[in-house]
Amino acid sequence: MRTNILPGKTILLALSVVFVCLWFTVVSAQDNYEIQVYGSETVPRGVTMIELHNNFTAKGAKTTDDGTLPTNHAWHETIEITHGFNEWFETGFYIFTSARNGSGWDYVGSHIRPRFRIPPKWKWPVGVSLSQEIGWVRRQFSEDQWSWEIRPIVDKELGKWYLSFNPALERALSGPGKKRGFEFAPNFKVAYSVTKKVDAGLEYYGSLGPLSGFDPAREQTHQIFPAIDLNVSPKWEFNFGVGIGMTRSTDHLIFKMIVGRRFEFAKKKSQPTSSPE
């Protein structure tokens, strides 16, 4: 992602505008906790990234037959904390929450996500990394309480264009979904730098079913998100998108926003000064 520095007031203004736009769509707040196509770059050594994922399902499922809460008018807040340990390894931790009209906020569950990256010094023609995410959620939010995801990540910058492909594999470790084995859930992003500060593009999120045999088309989920990224500062991350469901099994309208901030807690080593002779 390209980063540029704007004055502090501009950063606050950009954040306020996006947040207010999303706030007025919110009535209450389920099933979409982290909607993001990953880039291959990991958080630098000694840096901690804190992200807030805000997702509101404006038009989703109003009923369910598995005892979980429906997604319609579900508002999700996810806190993601990621720390970089060296130039090729990071670990992320997620805290999922959900809110609905009349029920207040609920703790949903937590995941942990270690990720490895091909070091830049290898000079591969594309960026490559691999993440694994494992975690647990409460039964009222999913029949399959324990889950595991393997996510290969390949990306490339071509002039003003940016492409990223995440052919993720997901598996339930408990519950009725365990017998389905690994399921194919590809994500893809294409973006174009409209200016040095604004990237506009499309994000795709899908779930096709088990590798042993994909689900019928009507049971698959496919979503397209027109999205923008604001490159306001090397320390900040902003992403906003509106998701449109393309099948009957997909939530039909979702608003998402990601706000992230990088913190460098480790003190830089001071250079020794030579004493005059």
What are these regions (language model features)?
Residues M1-R2, F96:
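Charged interaction patches that mediate protein-protein contacts
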Residues R2-L15:
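Bacterial N-terminal signal peptides that target proteins for export
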Residues N4-L6, F19, A29, Q36:
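Generic hydrophobic-segment detector
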Residues P7-G8, L22, N32, H76:
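Low-complexity intrinsically disordered segments
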Residues L13-W23:
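Bacterial N-terminal signal peptides
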Residues F24-S28:
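Membrane-interface motif at the C-terminal end of an N-terminal transmembrane signal
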Residues A29-E277:
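Transmembrane beta-barrel domains of Gram-negative outer membranes and organellar outer membranes
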